[in-house]
Amino acid sequence: MIRVLESLGRDFTIVFITGRWAMGQAKVDAFIDNLLPNIKKIVFCKPHDYPGTTAEYKLAQIKELESDGYKFYMGLDDHSAVIGLLHNHGMFVAKVISD
């Protein structure tokens, strides 16, 4: 993972979109900052009062970010058959590979 990040250079932002974490947004932010210091990142933690599923929340956040000009290239989820970067429903988002 570190090699992938190093090959990207410094002109990128990692977006984490997570499900409901009992610890709350502030602790999720601190947890991810501790994992990846000195790397630009945005963290979205699904609020407890969000009416939809975690998948719906993640897709809604991606659509909103894309409308703000972000470009997503790859999406990885811990429940994916491919790879997991965070436990407990964490997701590193850069492009949703499939609907």
What is the predicted function of each stretch?
Residues M1-V15, A22-A26, E56-L59:
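Short, acidic loop-to-helix structural element flanking the phosphoryl-transfer center
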Residues L5-G9, K63-E66, H87:
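Surface-exposed amphipathic alpha-helices with a cationic face
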Residues G9-F16, E66-F72:
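Short, surface-exposed connector motifs at secondary-structure boundaries
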Residues F12, K41, M91-F92:
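A structural micro-motif
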Residues I17, C45-K46, V96-D99:
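Conserved beta-strand termini and adjacent loop/short-helix elements that scaffold enzyme active sites
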Residues T18-W21, P47-H48, D78-A81:
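Acidic carboxylate-rich catalytic motifs and surrounding loops in phosphoryl-/glycosyl-chemistry enzymes
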Residues A22-K71:
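Substrate-recognition "cap/lid" segment bordering the active-site pocket of phosphatases
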Residues I62, Y70-D99:
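Acidic, Mg2+-coordinating phosphoryl-transfer loop and its flanking beta/alpha structural elements
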